[in-house]
């Protein structure tokens, strides 16, 4: 986990090309997840990286949100920023789906 928790900083570092936002809350209703996604997108624009959101609610598994456009060919430029244009899965599924993607 990143030591610096200032606005605009990535929460986690070490995955090149990705701007990682991480949230841990009591509950994670869809409206709140959509708000967090907006934060992830804004942060990724500042760092010139792809946005990804990791979140977990109490007594729930970790979930990951990332842009669906990454899996389209040709890839939309820029990627649509809306929450409706995302995929959600567990961390292993995210990694399996994106590990071979080029960051462009």
Spell out what each predicted region is.
Residues 1-104:
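Catalytic phosphate/metal-binding cores of nucleic-acid and nucleotide-processing enzymes, i.e., regions
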């Amino acid at each position: 986990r990143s030591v610096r928790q200032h606005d605009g900083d990535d929460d986690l570092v070490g995955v090149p090309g990705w701007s990682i936002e991480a949230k841990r809350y009591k509950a994670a209703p869809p409206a709140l997840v959509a708000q967090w996604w907006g934060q992830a997108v804004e942060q990724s624009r500042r760092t010139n990286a792809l946005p990804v959101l990791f979140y977990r609610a109490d007594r729930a598994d970790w979930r990951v949100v990332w842009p669906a456009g990454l899996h389209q060919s040709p890839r939309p430029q820029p990627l649509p920023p809306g929450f409706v244009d995302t995929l959600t899965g567990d961390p292993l599924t995210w990694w399996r789906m994106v590990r071979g993607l080029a960051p462009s």
